[in-house]
Amino acid sequence: MSKNTVSSARFRKVDVGEYDENKFVDEEDGGDGQAGPDEGEVDSCLRQGNMTAALQAALKNPPINTKSQAVKDRAGSIVLKVLISFKANDIEKAVQSLDKNGVDLLMKYIYKGFESPSDNSSAVLLQWHEKALAAGGVGSIVRVLTARKTV
């Protein structure tokens, strides 16, 4: 019996502390270089009246991996500015132009806008939420609420 135990003791070389669920290691993906969406490109599209291109530009290069709250706030304000400038009739077309990841990202920005409401932004965000929910389904809400990386 003891011979069997000694020969099979190799399994004990695993460091069980490595798999401790209470040991948190923050993953650093090197996202400090992310500056968020290009505000000049977004403003240019808004001035030209190309709202869908403005939305695409605002959702491009999201600051998900950065820890800088100032960059995240600036990106959120750019996206909110684009969402508010849409007409109610054009919202559904714009949401339909996004892919699944784009709808999820849009939903993240919608919930970010709900966190700090400004003048009349809640009504507009609710319209966007309705259309994004129709396009992405309940799964997009679940993915946004359970995501560890925020915008």
UniProtKB/Swiss-Prot annotation:
Xref: InterPro entries: ARPC5 (IPR006789), ARPC5_sf (IPR036743)
UniProt signal peptide: none
GO CC terms of this entry: Arp2/3 protein complex; cell projection; cytoplasm; cytosol; nucleus; site of double-strand break
GO MF annotation list: actin filament binding
Stated family: Belongs to the ARPC5 family.
PANTHER family reported in the protein's UniProt record: ARP2/3 COMPLEX 16 KD SUBUNIT P16-ARC
Name this polypeptide is given: Actin-related protein 2/3 complex subunit 5
Organism: Bos taurus (Bovine)
Taxonomic placement: Eukaryota, Metazoa, Chordata, Craniata, Vertebrata
Gene designation: ARPC5
